[in-house]
């Protein structure tokens, strides 16, 4: 049986992550408060950020920048702004 969490991003109950995907206290916070659906949304945004801003995950500054964006997206309700990207209209 899957576990459920009240997702901080989506503001609703959802299926929780199967295991802690990120290290440390932040990883624990994500595991306890973020649903699989919200995590999948973040992964999509993360890929766009890495590609568009040409981030190098070996660079500690780039990792810190990505972590800040992740916290803003998952916990503060801020969307990721990618310069020059226009989402497709519905």
From Swiss-Prot:
Q: What does this protein do?
A: Could be a mediator in iron transactions between iron acquisition and iron-requiring processes, such as synthesis and/or repair of Fe-S clusters in biosynthetic enzymes.
Q: Which Pfam families match?
A: Iron_traffic (PF04362)
Enumerate the transmembrane spans.
none
Write out the GO MF terms: iron ion binding
Specify the signal sequence span. none
State the UniProt keywords alphabetically: Iron
Q: Which family does it belong to?
A: Belongs to the Fe(2+)-trafficking protein family.
Q: What organism is recorded for this protein?
A: Vibrio campbellii (strain ATCC BAA-1116)
GO biological process terms on file = cellular response to oxidative stress
Report the protein name in the record. Answer: Probable Fe(2+)-trafficking protein
Its GO CC terms are: cytosol
């Amino acid at each position: 049986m899957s576990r459920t969490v009240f997702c901080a991003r989506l503001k609703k109950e959802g299926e929780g992550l199967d295991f802690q995907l990120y290290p440390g206290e932040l990883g624990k916070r994500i595991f306890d408060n973020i649903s699989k659906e919200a995590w999948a949304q973040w992964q999509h945004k993360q890929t766009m950020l890495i590609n568009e801003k040409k981030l190098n995950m070996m660079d500690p500054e780039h990792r810190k920048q990505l972590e800040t964006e992740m916290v803003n997206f998952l916990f503060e309700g801020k969307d990721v702004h990618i310069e020059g990207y226009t989402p497709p209209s519905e």
